[in-house]
Structures are given as C-alpha cells and as structure tokens.
C-alpha cells in the first residue's frame, strides 16, 4: 500500500524539533510498494524492491536530518519464520547501506541484542549475569517486555555516548573527531584551555 511516511515523519520532526530521535519501525514493510496512484512499483523478493526500499529509507533519513539532531534507528530483530527472516535481512541490509552514508544516523543492532548463542533467532536470551529471560511472544516476532528493555538500554547507552548533558551538539554531518571519539551531530570535544602569555618564556 502507499503512505508517504518520509514526508509525514519529516513534518513531525520539524514541529517537535527533537535532538535525539529514536525509531524502531518497518516490521511490516515487506510488502508490495506502490506509488501515490496505488500502482505496484516493486514486489518483495525482487531486485527492484530492494532499490525502491533503499530509496524510501534514504528519504526518511534525509528528511529527519537537522542541525543538533541524531537519529537512533533500531534494526529489525530476527524472526522465527524463515520466510519472514529473509525479508528482515533484506530490509536491514538497505538500512545499513543507507546509514553508512549518513553520519547523523546511529544504528542500534536489534538482531545482535536479541540473538541466541549462535547469533540467530532465539526465544530466550542469556543476560551478562547469567540470567535467562524470555525474549519473544508466541508469534516469533514481537519482543517481550524484558527483551524490549535490552534494546532500550542499548539505545540509551548510545545516546549517552553521543551527548553529555549541557553540551551543544555539532551540526549534522560534522566529521568524526578522532580526539574525542564523538560522531557527527554529537557534542563537540572540550576546547583546549587558553594559553597564559605570562607563562611563556623566550628562553
């Protein structure tokens, strides 16, 4: 079906003007893609679908770009169904490739955060303290509260790495500063203390 999501999201962001924007959407995107007239332009599983989906992801990311803003995008977690998993991989691939060219986008690795020991889908996950928690509801898709918290905590950690309270964020697209490890649109590194002329000598 057709819905101009990129335009709507851009409008909402322009009105709300968030500095940190967290999104986890797209779980139902593996369907026919249509134009405004309802005409099918791409079907799932075809090369054309990947091209069109990438174009729409690009539109979303570009529409949400703004100075002093970072977009934290959660990749779709793996699912139990092999058929649907292929769609998840296809969607995440296009998102990863788009984000690689857009330094104002930080990806949260939903598949890795909810994976089992083999790195794939898991009904249960083991926490660092050894405690095992249920990760999925019976449909093999939706996350439980416990697993949602894992993803949320990881997202908050990424936000904390990007911003320090009270600091001003750099403009979107600012190159990585190797002196402080901050990425684009994150806070600038602390300025070096001014030099005291009285402390200098002529030898």
Regions found by a protein language model. Name each.
Residues 13-17, 66, 100-101, 150:
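Extracellular/periplasmic catalytic domains that process cell-envelope and extracellular macromolecules
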Residues 11-12, 59-63, 97-98, 158:
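A generic secondary-structure signal
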Residues 4, 8, 20, 45-48, ...:
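Extracytoplasmic/secreted proteins, especially bacterial periplasmic and envelope-associated proteins
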Residues 1-52, 186, 190-203:
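Conserved SGNH/GDSL esterase-like catalytic core that processes O-acyl groups on lipids
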Residues 79-193, 197:
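Catalytic His-Asp segment of secreted/periplasmic serine-dependent ester chemistry enzymes
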Residues 24-30, 34, 58-92:
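Active-site segments of SGNH/GDSL-like serine hydrolases
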Residues 1, 11, 42-51, 61, ...:
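Second-shell loop/turn segments in exported
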Residues 19-25, 70-75, 106-109, 142:
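Structural recognition of the beta-strand scaffold that forms the well-ordered cores
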């Amino acid at each position: 079906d057709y819905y101009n999501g990129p335009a709507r999201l851009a409008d909402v962001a322009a009105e709300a003007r968030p500095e940190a924007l967290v999104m986890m959407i797209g779980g139902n995107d593996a369907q026919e893609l249509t134009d405004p007239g309802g005409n099918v332009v791409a079907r799932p599983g075809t090369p054309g679908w990947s091209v069109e989906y990438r174009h729409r992801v690009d539109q979303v990311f570009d529409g949400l770009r703004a100075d002093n803003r970072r977009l934290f995008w959660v990749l779709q977690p793996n699912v139990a169904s092999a058929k649907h998993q292929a769609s998840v991989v296809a969607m995440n691939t296009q998102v990863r490739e788009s984000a690689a060219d857009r330094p104002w986008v930080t990806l949260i690795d939903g598949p890795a955060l909810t994976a089992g020991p083999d790195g794939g889908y898991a009904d249960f996950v083991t926490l660092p303290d050894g405690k095992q928690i249920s990760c999925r509801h019976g449909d093999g898709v939706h996350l439980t509260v416990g697993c949602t918290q894992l993803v949320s905590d990881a997202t908050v950690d990424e936000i904390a790495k990007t911003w320090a309270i009270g600091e001003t964020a750099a403009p979107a697209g600012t190159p990585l500063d190797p002196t402080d490890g901050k990425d684009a649109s994150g806070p600038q590194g602390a300025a070096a203390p001014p030099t005291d002329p009285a402390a200098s000598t002529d030898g």
